[in-house]
């Protein structure tokens, strides 16, 4: 089954799994999804992820979700740039999420990164989603 917006699919799977207090969730594997998950892992929003190869040849990413005192670490995850309405931001206009308590994940010419890393690298790009 193909999906038209893999980032929205990934975000929805994470959000739904956390609402059901699942410890792990699987998603179809891709380089872009792995890059997004690497950012979420480095920022401390998920425990980790692993690529699982199936006998049929397709691979999946198994995401280990993170909880603190029984509550999900990700309180809010929201898509910003959508296929029908792309949102781009220069370095000067990168959004701050809840006064810096959350992050924006961007797709830049230097790869997918968090907003503070983009400021340090002095690059702007497409604002994929925000996490708090």
Curated annotation (Swiss-Prot):
Similarity remark: Belongs to the universal ribosomal protein uS8 family.
Species, as recorded: Afipia carboxidovorans (strain ATCC 49405 / DSM 1227 / KCTC 32145 / OM5) (Oligotropha carboxidovorans)
GO terms under biological process: translation
Its job: One of the primary rRNA binding proteins, it binds directly to 16S rRNA central domain where it helps coordinate assembly of the platform of the 30S subunit.
Superkingdom: Bacteria
PROSITE patterns for this protein: RIBOSOMAL_S8 (PS00053)
Protein name: Small ribosomal subunit protein uS8
NCBIfam families (UniProt xref): PRK00136.1 (NF001109)
One Pfam family matching this protein: Ribosomal_S8
MF terms (GO), sorted A to Z: rRNA binding; structural constituent of ribosome
């Amino acid at each position: 089954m193909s999906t038209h917006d893999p980032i929205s699919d990934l975000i929805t799977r994470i959000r739904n799994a956390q609402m059901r207090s699942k410890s792990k969730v699987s998603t179809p594997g891709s380089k872009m999804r792995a890059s997004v998950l690497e950012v979420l892992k480095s920022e401390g929003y998920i425990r980790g992820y692993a690529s699982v190869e199936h006998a049929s040849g397709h691979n999946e990413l198994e995401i280990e979700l993170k909880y603190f005192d029984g509550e999900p670490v990700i309180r809010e995850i929201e898509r910003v740039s959508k296929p029908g309405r792309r949102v781009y931001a220069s370095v000067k206009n990168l959004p701050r999420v809840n006064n810096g308590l959350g992050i924006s994940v961007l797709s830049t010419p230097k790869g997918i990164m968090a907003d503070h890393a983009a400021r340090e690298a002095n690059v702007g790009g497409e604002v994929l989603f925000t996490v708090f």
